[in-house]
């Protein structure tokens, strides 16, 4: 499934086709002409495949300026099935975060399709955490946070995850 994060400058004006329609047309062409796996169903209860992986998931944010920035995260449903949400109490602190991350990766085990890339969202509501985690997956894998203590946590968790010996 194609997940898009779109930042639109407040001074941008689109003409012609609606942005959502244009993105879905791009997804349609990419999946039908690019020989990519078609795995999206229009209605999850009926299970009828759309055969072109539309509609895409769009997250749109209005920002300052006159530019458009689009990031796309092609997601397989194996990775979606391995997603986890942990609601921690404030008293759980950073240890609770560490435990939750390792538990999620351990539980996913070999069921997640390689390579395993872990996105973590911390704070806010249920939906905000999921969105933050998904946005984290759009960062280059060799890029770390600019915040020193977050960078330290990322490096620590990568080391501990690799020590699990999952693959």
Residue ranges of each PLM-predicted region?
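N-terminal glycine-rich anion-binding loops that anchor highly charged ligand groups
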Residues: 1
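Non-transmembrane, aqueous-exposed alpha-helical and coiled segments at domain scale
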Residues: 4-120, 125-167
């Amino acid at each position: 499934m194609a997940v898009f994060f779109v930042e639109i400058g407040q001074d941008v004006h689109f003409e012609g086709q609606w942005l959502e329609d244009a993105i879905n047309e791009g997804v349609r062409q990419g999946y039908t002409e690019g020989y990519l796996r078609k795995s999206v169903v229009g209605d999850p209860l009926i299970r009828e495949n759309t055969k072109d992986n539309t509609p895409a998931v769009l997250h749109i944010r209005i920002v300052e300026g006159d530019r458009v920035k689009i990031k796309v995260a092609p997601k397989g449903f194996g990775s979606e099935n391995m997603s986890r949400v942990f609601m921690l109490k404030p008293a759980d602190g950073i240890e609770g975060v560490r435990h939750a991350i390792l538990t999620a990766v351990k539980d996913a085990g070999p069921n997640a399709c390689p390579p395993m890339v872990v996105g973590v969202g911390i704070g806010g509501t249920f939906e905000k955490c999921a969105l933050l985690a998904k946005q984290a997956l759009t960062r280059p894998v060799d890029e770390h946070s600019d915040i020193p203590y977050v960078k330290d946590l990322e490096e620590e968790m990568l080391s501990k995850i690799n020590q699990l010996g999952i693959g």
